[in-house]
């Protein structure tokens, strides 16, 4: 792993990123979830190192150490990544997105097809504004979407109120209690009993909240907006992985996404949930991605 580095954007803005895996390997841009940050890519480090994969994991604008970009759109992301790629001396690349990182990987694939070889979408977020029936979403997501539409200022206040608590690091002895409070699928709870996996998931979330509530909110707003392109515009190979026990985004929603992608190889994994899929299957995911 390499220490955090920064790429200069327009004006005084910067984007922070870290690298994992093999520094001389096949380049893969990692798109973290929400709320999360670049250190979520710790999940990839050992398998990426063994497989000869170079993981470049940036914080999105406003997250952790990257500068806030108010009112940003999903369409702004490819330009940020171009700066990161040029800074790192990378031409063609692949992308790996987990959960809320999915729209960002799709955006790169749709607008940078000359550089994107393939993308892997793992328990990925779907185009939420296109949903006619939101029952396949986690209830918390349904509630936030409804509040964003009806009382956005209240939602912003709630984010600011939650930040001091969600930025805290809970004592190790309280982790079992935290896992019970989250009401996770058994497969997810079991996977998160691994200390390294727990840290990769939850420390990356805490880093996001420590940055600012405004940054987390700006990232959340992306999901409540049109993407600016359709899934049918993504012509690069897509490797879609989704657990049949996923509570955040039902695998039925993922099946509909797979049908719309022109070049998609989808795998729906039994007894895998939103957390256990990337924790248990990262080696297979990376092997499949670099072979595309």
Label for each model-derived stretch:
Residues 76-94:
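Conserved acidic catalytic loop of the alpha/beta-hydrolase fold
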Residues 24-25, 32-37, 99, 244:
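Active-site glycine-rich loops that stabilize anionic/oxyanionic intermediates
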Residues 34-46, 70:
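The serine-hydrolase catalytic nucleophile loop
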């Amino acid at each position: 792993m390499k220490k955090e580095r920064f790429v200069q954007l327009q004006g005084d803005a910067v984007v922070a990123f870290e690298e994992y895996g093999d520094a001389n390997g096949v380049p893969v841009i990692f798109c973290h979830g929400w709320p999360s940050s670049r250190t979520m890519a710790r999940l990839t480090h050992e398998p990426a190192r063994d497989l000869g994969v170079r993981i470049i994991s940036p914080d999105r604008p406003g997250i952790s150490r990257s500068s806030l970009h108010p009112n940003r759109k999903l369409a702004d992301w490819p330009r940020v990544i171009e700066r990161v790629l040029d800074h790192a001396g990378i031409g063609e690349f692949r992308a790996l997105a987990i959960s809320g990182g999915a729209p960002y990987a799709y955006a790169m694939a749709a607008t940078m097809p000359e550089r994107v070889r393939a993308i892997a979408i793992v328990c990925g977020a779907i185009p939420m504004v296109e949903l006619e029936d939101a029952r396949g979403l986690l209830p918390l997501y349904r509630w936030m979407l409804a509040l964003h539409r009806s009382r956005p200022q209240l939602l912003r206040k709630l984010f600011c109120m939650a930040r001091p608590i969600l930025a805290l690091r809970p004592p190790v002895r309280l982790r079992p209690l935290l896992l019970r409070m989250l009401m996770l699928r058994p497969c997810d709870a079991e996977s998160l009993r691994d200390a390294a996996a727990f840290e990769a998931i939850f420390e990356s979330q805490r880093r996001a909240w420590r940055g600012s509530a405004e940054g987390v909110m700006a990232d959340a707003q992306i999901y409540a907006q049109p993407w600016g392109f359709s899934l049918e515009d993504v012509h690069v190979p897509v490797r879609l992985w989704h657990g049949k026990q996923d509570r955040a985004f039902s695998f039925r929603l993922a099946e509909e996404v797979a049908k719309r992608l022109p070049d998609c190889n989808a795998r729906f994994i039994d007894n895998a949930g939103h957390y256990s899929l990337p924790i248990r299957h990262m080696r297979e995911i990376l092997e499949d991605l670099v072979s595309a």
